[in-house]
Amino acid sequence: MSFGRPGFADVFKPSPPARGSFPLDHDGECKAFMISYLKCMKENANDNGKCRLFSKQYLECRMDKGLMARDDMANLGLGDVVDPSALPPASTQTTTAPLSNPPHVPQPPSSEHRI
């Protein structure tokens, strides 16, 4: 019996995924990152563009814990995602070049020069 396919057909040979297989996170090492990502997806009506930072953090956790092979984030489509907490605050940024002509601020006349 052929059970739905011709008996002369070649045997099906599965092919492995292009990036290999990823072990499951049985110990929950990256569960917090996964929950953050899923929460973001729910809050943003499954718009993954708004949750790319969470996706990057989750993949970094998996790579750090050995749950997937280390790869460059650009290869994973997340090379342009920047963590805003890693940036210096805007108030502490200073200019490196001094002002050549500082703006003139008029001063009120002193009482000594009044007539």
Curated annotation (Swiss-Prot):
Residues 27-69 form the CHCH domain. One of its GO terms (cellular component) is mitochondrial intermembrane space. Residues 100-109 have a biased composition (Pro residues). Its main location: cytoplasm. It holds the Pfam family CHCH. Residues 90-99 have a biased composition (Polar residues). Residues 1-23, 80-115 are annotated as: Disordered. GO terms for biological process: mitochondrial cytochrome c oxidase assembly. A motif (Cx9C motif 1) lies at residues 30-40. A motif (Cx9C motif 2) lies at residues 51-61. Disulfide bonds join C30-C61, C40-C51. It is found in: Cytoplasm; Mitochondrion intermembrane space. Keywords: Cytoplasm, Disulfide bond, Mitochondrion. Required for the assembly of mitochondrial cytochrome c oxidase. Belongs to the COX19 family. This is Cytochrome c oxidase assembly protein COX19. It comes from Cryptococcus neoformans var. neoformans serotype D (strain JEC21 / ATCC MYA-565). The gene is COX19.
